[in-house]
Every structure is written in C-alpha cells, then in structure tokens.
Amino acid sequence: LFLRAKDKDLSADCVRAYNDWHIDEWCGAYPDRFIPMAIVPLWDPKLAANEIRRAAEKGCHAVTFSENPEKLGLPGLHLDHWDPFFAACEEVNTVVCMHIGSSSSMTVTSLDAPVDVSIAITPMNSFLALNDLIWTPILQKFPKIRIALSEGGIGWIPYALERMDYT
C-alpha cells in the first residue's frame, strides 16, 4: 500500500502511525496474547532501519518483510542494498518475518488451474525464499539474524535440505 504511494514523506508518517496504533493500542490491549509485528518503509532501507529501532524501543521485535522484494520492483536480496535493514534487525534482536505471497506473487501452474492447486503449492514460496536467502551474503554478514518463514508449513524442508546439500 505505502510502497506505491507518490508522497513518500506521507507514506513514512502513515507507517509510523500504523505501528504506533498496532503496537500501543491493538497489541498493547492484550500484551500477553498478541505479539506486535511492525511494518517498515521498504522503499528506503535506512528509514526502515530507523523504524525497526523505534518499534523495538516500544517492545516490538518482529517486522514484516517480503519473501521476494524484487517482485515488488525493489532490489533483490543478493545486493547490499538491504544491509541497513538487516543490521538494524540484528542489532535490536528483531525477527524478520517473511510472509508467503507478500511479494504479490504466488506460484501457479497454469492460468486455468483451480484455486486448490495454488493452495496446495503455496509452500513453494517458502522454499524459494529460503533458497534465495541461503545463497545471499545476508546470513554470513548478520550471523545473529533471525528469520521466520510464515505460513509455509514444514513438509518442504527435507527436500530443501537435500537440494542444498547437493547443489
């Protein structure tokens, strides 16, 4: 939503306002039940890093991030473009939560396939995201980074490990 907006200053203000509401009001109402997860201005990794630190000061240690930022028109994970973002997450012990489909792109077999096919192969987004991460310098540069691949299940993990071992 905010990534595509023309007024980036207003968008950044909206991100901060959303995080304040989400952390303080929504999750703050039931702190033993809800875990807040911040959003960040993905169009600027330095602004994103600042928002991660600001959210951490409020007690929020999880942040959403696209499983494939390149599909959103942003630089890919293999570039140092994202270093300020990942450095901030490591610095304040914030988990990077990569949600499947957050790149606005899901794996499809064919345009005429029923929705059931897409639902069944959704974990492939997690498989693709993990493989992309493994071959980036991110995990070496930021060895204490914590990453969560959300809603992809675990059935694909043995296959992913086997592929990584023999690639």
For the regions a language model picked out, list residue spans one by one.
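Surface-exposed, active-site-proximal loop segments in enzymatic domains
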Residues: F2-S11, K46
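Catalytic pocket of metal/acid-base enzymes, prominently hydrolases
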Residues: L1, I23-G28
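A short small-residue
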Residues: L1-L3, P114-V115
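Catalytic pocket-lining loop regions of alpha/beta-barrel enzymes
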Residues: C27, D32-I35, V40-T167
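Active-site-proximal gating segment of KS-fold condensing enzymes and close homologs
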Residues: D9-E25
